[in-house]
A protein has these predicted regions:
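Non-catalytic signal-transmission and effector/linker regions of two-component phosphorelay proteins
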Residues: 1-18, 51, 115-133
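Conserved acidic carboxylate
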Residues: 23
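Two-component/phosphorelay signaling modules centered on CheY-like receiver
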Residues: 26-45
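Acidic, metal-coordinating helix/loop segments flanking the phosphotransfer/catalytic sites
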Residues: 46-64
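Acidic catalytic/metal-coordinating carboxylates
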Residues: 49, 75-78
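Active-site residues of response regulator receiver
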Residues: 68
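Hydrophobic/aromatic residues positioned on beta-strands within the core alpha/beta folds
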Residues: 93-94
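A Lys-centered signature of the CheY-like receiver
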Residues: 112
Length: 133
């Protein structure tokens, strides 16, 4: 574990949190997965498309889904709706402004590129303190 992640983990108390990663960029998805795992978060995915995310949802019930809003040219609004229907908190990540996200029910929006510190803050925002482990 990197010293940065170790220091954050000591304060994060996000152990056993289950997060679904939905990101079409292999590099971003793997970096995100590695960072989450360093924080002792259980990671499902990454999924590169809404269909892949749906298949993972059939197998697991994540607490939070981190979703890139634009997945290979397909906007993820329908997936976000389905995640909300299942009680999964959604964090949208995007490399550009997407005004339509304001119309979606999301716990938070994280602008790419983002730091480990920003990711941790967003996860804390997405999970109320009463539910943090």
């Amino acid at each position: 574990m990197s010293s940065t992640a170790a220091a954050m983990c000591a304060n994060a108390d996000l152990r056993d949190l289950q997060v679904l990663v939905v990101e079409d960029s292999w590099h971003v998805a793997n970096a995100l997965k590695s960072l989450l795992e360093e924080l002792s978060v259980k990671v499902a995915g990454p999924a590169a498309t809404p269909a892949e995310a749906e298949r993972l949802l059939a197998l697991r019930k994540p607490d939070v889904a981190i979703v890139d809003i634009n997945l290979k040219g397909e906007m993820a609004y329908g997936l976000i709706d389905r995640l909300n229907e299942r009680g999964v908190r959604v964090v949208v990540i995007s490399g550009y402004a997407v005004p339509q996200v304001a119309q979606c029910k999301v716990a938070a929006v994280l602008q790419k590129p983002f730091s480990a510190k920003a990711l941790l803050a967003i996860l804390r925002q997405a999970i109320p303190a009463s539910e943090a482990r």
